[in-house]
């Protein structure tokens, strides 16, 4: 392994040179990765990582850890406490802030990645730089947003909205997309509800509930805690959201407060629902189990509020434990994984489920090629004026994670 001279020269070299010499065997490296649910999602990552390992003469092992039974979460906690285990781990949501003291700074990695891939979504940076420097590397693999997935026919017949004209396949949103606001959303919810096809919006203590509600709050500039940690519950913006949610709640299925993360998917796939907020997993299930429903689904942008159009983000990251014995090799691998060509392979291998955190890498054809109907996922990645947001931001991550874990926002909406 190449050893750099300490000081400024070392920093400059680290930015431009590989982290691992190809002249010598670089020991072993182990990864604990999220087990991708899309067939092929793990296979393509294996190919990319092992390609690097063969070139750099690294003995690389990859363990794919399921979220079922919290296996991945428990493994992270156990390794952090024992200060032993994998070198690199997969993290999600608020975990990089929770384990910041056990993570190796990776600002040198991110400097190289950003120089190649361009600016990163602010929502990813909000978590990844909580300590001041990057302590994790944002991941394309497993990162997703939860935009609307809607019935084309119900919207056209019952709400008078042509989603395919507003969000055409393979193109940016049409000018009339400016009219797709939360006010329009409320009117459409009422019309579809009266026609027997209510929007499937969960309001329980689940991630799906928190994610769409968080986007609603952001669209109105409402926050329960500000970036400095001050409580900001009693504001006109929060009151406006609560008033809106009271009106919306009347048009939802009566049991949404008890829904789990599968309930909204089932609602849509059953043919009962006109809209849910979800990544393409609901459409994939419909394509398998209810093809007559799948061919009528369209993924498109979030409604716009007074402060903008925000899509809920569920991010993933790779972090390097500060007790790793092969940090140089780990950093080299993280740079390799995040090269544009490899990001493109990851997105294609997951059939478009994964979303790159870099705006300049959102033009892949994989989303336009999905169907039926043709182009149904064209507007899954951000197009136009939509931005990603972490629910409960801009509160400092340790506070935001508690707001999120305790489902404060959806509970407020249910209880008013």
Show the residue positions of the predicted features.
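Hinge/lid segment of periplasmic solute-binding proteins
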Residues: 92-147, 156, 183, 296-303, ...
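Paired acidic/hydrophobic, glycine-rich loop segments that form the ligand-binding mouth/hinge
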Residues: 87-90, 274-278
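A ligand-binding cleft/hinge motif common to bilobed small-molecule-binding domains
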Residues: 95-99, 280-293
């Amino acid at each position: 392994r190449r050893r750099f001279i300490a000081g400024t020269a070392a920093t400059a070299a680290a930015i431009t040179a590989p982290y691992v010499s190809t002249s010598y065997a670089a020991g072993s490296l182990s990864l604990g990765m999220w087990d991708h649910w899309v067939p092929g999602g793990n296979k393509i990552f294996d190919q990319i990582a092992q390609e690097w390992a063969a070139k750099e003469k690294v003995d690389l092992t990859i363990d794919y850890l399921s979220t079922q039974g919290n296996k991945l979460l428990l493994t992270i906690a156990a390794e952090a406490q024992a200060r032993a285990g994998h070198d690199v781990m997969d993290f999600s949501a608020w975990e990089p802030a929770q384990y910041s003291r056990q993570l190796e700074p990776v600002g040198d990695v991110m400097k190289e990645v950003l120089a190649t891939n361009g600016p990163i979504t602010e929502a990813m940076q909000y978590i990844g730089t909580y300590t001041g420097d990057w302590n994790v590397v944002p991941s394309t693999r497993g990162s997703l947003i939860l935009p609307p997935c809607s019935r084309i026919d119900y919207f056209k017949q019952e709400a008078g909205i042509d989603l395919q004209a507003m969000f055409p396949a393979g193109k940016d949103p049409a000018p009339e997309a400016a009219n797709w606001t939360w006010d329009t959303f409320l009117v459409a919810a009422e019309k579809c509800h009266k026609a027997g096809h209510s929007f499937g919006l969960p309001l329980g203590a689940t991630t799906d509930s928190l994610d769409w509600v968080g986007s609603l709050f952001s669209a109105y500039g409402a926050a329960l805690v500000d970036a400095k940690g001050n409580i900001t519950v009693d504001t006109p913006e929060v009151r406006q959201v609560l008033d809106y949610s009271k009106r919306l709640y009347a048009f939802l299925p009566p049991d949404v407060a008890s829904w789990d993360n599968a309930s909204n998917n089932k609602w849509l796939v059953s043919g009962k629902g006109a809209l849910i907020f979800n990544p393409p997993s609901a459409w994939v299930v419909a394509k398998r189990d209810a093809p007559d429903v799948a061919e009528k689904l369209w993924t498109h942008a979030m409604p716009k509020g007074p402060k903008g159009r925000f899509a809920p983000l569920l991010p993933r990251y790779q972090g390097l434990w500060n007790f790793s014995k092969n940090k140089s090799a780990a950093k080299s691998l993280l740079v390799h994984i995040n090269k544009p060509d490899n990001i493109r392979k990851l997105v294609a291998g997951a059939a478009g489920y994964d979303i790159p955190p870099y705006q300049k890498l959102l033009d892949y054809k994989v989303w336009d090629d999905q169907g039926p109907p043709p182009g149904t996922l064209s507007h899954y990645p951000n197009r136009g004026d939509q931005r990603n947001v972490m629910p409960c931001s801009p509160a400092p991550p340790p506070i935001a994670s508690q707001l999120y874990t305790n489902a404060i926002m959806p509970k407020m909406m249910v209880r008013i």
